[in-house]
Design a protein with these regions (language model features):
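Short linear S-[DN]-x-LW-Φ motif typified by the pepsin-like aspartic protease active-site region
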Residues: 2-126, 137, 141-167, 175-178, ...
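A mature extracytoplasmic/lumenal domain signature
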Residues: 89, 98, 109, 120, ...
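Acidic/histidine-rich helix-loop elements
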Residues: 133-135
Length: 293
């Protein structure tokens, strides 16, 4: 004869609920661990592919520098204490090879495809328009040449979608490459496309990835704040894990800090190492990986 749930004593009902909850929790955590491993594997594969694409971009850039006649705009340092770079179509490259006291923005493409001007002490560079005009289908590459020891007060690197439903892929997606970038603060906003910064030296780092991919390698003297929606962020920082205190939020995505994984957190996880610096990591369904060297 079948029993009813109400026939179970309160004591046994309590333990029954406890066992069911434990079973569900174990299943969820097992599933989240599997998902985390899958995301981590896909994350590594994606960045391997991204690395190859950046290498191809680098070769293309050097070929263009060798072959092209460039359009140039030159600014003295007092008009470029800050840099605001936004790429909606094509590629932008920051290199530290300019003469002293001069910052040069150049491209072999017509200046109708890119724009540069100084507003007070901020240099503003835009590649590609907000809409897909016919000439925007050309893959524009611009170069920002900076003096070897120059340190910006603040740098903003943004890759954005254009205002329509055109598909963005590795062939036409926006990308920024920066080597040896120095700034009091670096902000990276990857709505789409990709940003790679290597050999950087900054006082503070902020990264926001929507569906874009971000690679950052370098030294950060202060706090790090990283948010990732469905994109991917990879940080390779000078120093050690213990140099930071941590605030970690992760839903369905994957966060890895120096080999330790975090996923499916029901609430924010705080780690206090008694450090002078703080790292905030917030991931929705994407992936964040932090390594130290």
């Amino acid at each position: 004869m079948g029993g009813r749930l109400s026939d179970v004593s309160a004591y046994h009902y309590s333990w029954l609920g406890h066992d069911i909850a434990d079973g569900i929790t174990r299943d969820i955590r097992s599933g989240m661990d599997d998902l985390s491993r899958d995301l981590s594997d896909n994350f590594d594969d994606s960045f391997d592919e991204l690395g190859r694409e950046f290498d191809d971009i680098g070769r293309s850039i050097h070929d263009r520098l060798d072959d092209g006649v460039l359009n140039e705009s030159t600014f003295s340092e007092i008009y470029a204490r800050k840099l605001d770079l936004e790429v909606r179509r094509g590629k932008a490259v920051i290199v530290y090879d300019a003469p002293a006291d001069k910052i040069v923005v150049s491209s072999e493409e017509d200046m109708a495809l890119w724009n540069v001007y100084s507003e007070e002490d901020e240099l503003k560079v835009t590649v590609g328009s907000k809409s897909w005009d016919s000439h925007d289908y050309k893959d524009t590459v611009i170069y920002i040449h900076v003096p070897a020891d120059y340190r910006f007060e603040k740098v903003e690197l943004k890759v954005k979608a254009q205002s329509n439903n055109k598909i963005i892929n590795s062939d036409n997606g926006p990308a920024i490459v920066a080597e040896g970038l120095k700034a009091g603060k670096i902000e990276i906003d990857a709505s789409v496309g990709a940003v790679r910064v290597t050999g950087a030296d900054t006082g503070k780092l902020e990264v926001d990835s929507d569906v874009g991919a971000v690679q950052f390698e370098g030294k950060v003297d202060g706090d790090v704040d990283t948010e990732c929606s469905v994109g991917a962020v990879k940080l390779d920082l000078a120093g050690a894990k213990a140099d930071f205190n941590y605030e970690i939020k992760c839903k369905v995505g994957s966060i890895t800090v120096d080999g330790e994984g975090f996923s499916g957190l029901s609430r924010e996880k705080k780690i206090n190492n008694g450090a002078a610096k703080k790292m905030e990591l917030d991931c929705n369904t994407g992936a964040i990986e932090v390594k130290f060297h």
